[in-house]
Amino acid sequence: MGVFDYKNLGTEASKTLFADATAITLYTYHNLDNGFAVGYQQHGLGLGCRHTGRGVARQHRLPGSDPPAFPGILTRKRPPWTRCTQPVGRQSSASALGYGGKVDARGTFFGEKAGYTTAQAEVLGKYDDAGKLLEIGIGFRGTSGPRESLITTPCRSGQRPARRAGPQGLCEKLCRRTFGGLLKTVADYAGAHGLSGKDVLVSGHSLGGLAVNSMADLSTSKWAGFYKDANYLAYASPTQSAGDKVLNIGYENDPVFRALDGSTFNLSSLGVHDKAHESTTDNIVSFNDHYASTLWNVLPFSIANLSTWVSHLPSAYGDGMTRVLESGFYEQMTRDSTIILCPTWSDPARANTWVQDLNRNAEPHTGNTFIIGSDGNDLIQGGKGADFIEGGKGNDTIRDNSGHNTFLFSGHFGQDRIIGYQPTGWCSRAPTAAPTCATTRRPWGPIRC
């Protein structure tokens, strides 16, 4: 089974579903973490950390930092999203659905019951060339808010219901209490347009991922069972449903993804918590400044240690997990493969640190290791086993430590150099064209009147 294979869809259909779910999830944040991502990329978490913070503030002030359009999610007729311009048709979503709840100028839907009113969700549609509705996408935003209320909204959106219900209770009740009416309206709208639950994709990140798991758990007993066959992909969810109804995607070194034992809080939640679950990816590592630094790792790995949260950012998931999807090694990867990703590697750290499997704060890694580089000039080091190394773009330096590694050079891979290479009777392969994920995708856009 491939890393992101879901239900019985097959590899190519699962890839398309994953790409759509990622696009929907990133859209729900309206590019919220762009400021930090830019500052971190330029300055990292070391001595440049203060510059990273300055970049966050600067990015949130500058008109030029408005969220761009996300390819594959907006309709052809819809102009790029900006903070000042209301996109054509966006506000029509609520009226098109026949929904009377709270909605803002962006078309974002808000929680319906007291104590949950700052929860936020998006409803998007996918259409054919004739304008016929093909699929509906539901995206739940994580514990955050729009950029203009960056502090106040997160403080209200998730903590209050979490304190009241606890993880297990929150997971069971979140969707019913926050968007029960909206989800009924969407189900009625979908049925009126000839769609079934199989035509609905539900996605979200962090607390939004928890909402995805909550909706999946309730899908058979609520909303007349309409959503029982829907597709559920959650990113960085602190809770993971049992069974295979939800694909829970997360980094091994994301403290939020590893906070709970399924839906139970225990003492291990405050430290290293690496239990495998049926519905989760368990060995994908975001090789970032924190993971690589011996100094940063003197502090305990914990959800209470804010420096570990660099692996939790939406942008880290959008870029990193897409690298897995587009890798030439994808066919060789499985759900339990050890995969090291470094697209969230800052420029200062990239210049003098070797990307490798450090196996930090986790159960021992076994089997083959896949290391996928970034678009920059990476230093990549294989281990003693049979590693699969793909440098990516840029001029990479790759160190071979075993003589049993497989190297993939594809597309615009730059001027790469291998040191310590020990031939074992066969050569690394060099395709003439970049491996591609050749699937037909239609854009997601607002529900139309």
Curated annotation (Swiss-Prot):
<feature type="region of interest" description="Disordered">
    <location>
        <begin position="58"/>
        <end position="77"/>
    </location>
</feature>
<dbReference type="Pfam" id="PF00353">
    <property type="entry name" value="HemolysinCabind"/>
</dbReference>
<feature type="binding site">
    <location>
        <position position="396"/>
    </location>
    <ligand>
        <name>Ca(2+)</name>
    </ligand>
</feature>
<keyword id="KW-0106">Calcium</keyword>
<keyword id="KW-0732">Signal</keyword>
<feature type="repeat" description="Hemolysin-type calcium-binding 1">
    <location>
        <begin position="372"/>
        <end position="389"/>
    </location>
</feature>
<feature type="repeat" description="Hemolysin-type calcium-binding 2">
    <location>
        <begin position="390"/>
        <end position="407"/>
    </location>
</feature>
<feature type="active site" description="Charge relay system">
    <location>
        <position position="206"/>
    </location>
</feature>
<feature type="binding site">
    <location>
        <position position="387"/>
    </location>
    <ligand>
        <name>Ca(2+)</name>
    </ligand>
</feature>
<feature type="binding site">
    <location>
        <position position="318"/>
    </location>
    <ligand>
        <name>Ca(2+)</name>
    </ligand>
</feature>
<dbReference type="GO" id="GO:0005509">
    <property type="term" value="F:calcium ion binding"/>
</dbReference>
<dbReference type="InterPro" id="IPR029058">
    <property type="entry name" value="AB_hydrolase_fold"/>
</dbReference>
<protein>
    <recommendedName>
        <fullName>Lipase</fullName>
        <ecNumber>3.1.1.3</ecNumber>
    </recommendedName>
</protein>
<dbReference type="GO" id="GO:0004806">
    <property type="term" value="F:triacylglycerol lipase activity"/>
</dbReference>
<keyword id="KW-0479">Metal-binding</keyword>
<keyword id="KW-0378">Hydrolase</keyword>
<feature type="signal peptide">
    <location>
        <begin position="1"/>
        <end position="23"/>
    </location>
</feature>
<keyword id="KW-0442">Lipid degradation</keyword>
<keyword id="KW-0443">Lipid metabolism</keyword>
<dbReference type="InterPro" id="IPR001343">
    <property type="entry name" value="Hemolysn_Ca-bd"/>
</dbReference>
<dbReference type="GO" id="GO:0016042">
    <property type="term" value="P:lipid catabolic process"/>
</dbReference>
<keyword id="KW-0677">Repeat</keyword>
<comment type="similarity">
    <text>Belongs to the AB hydrolase superfamily. Lipase family.</text>
</comment>
<dbReference type="InterPro" id="IPR011049">
    <property type="entry name" value="Serralysin-like_metalloprot_C"/>
</dbReference>
<dbReference type="InterPro" id="IPR018511">
    <property type="entry name" value="Hemolysin-typ_Ca-bd_CS"/>
</dbReference>
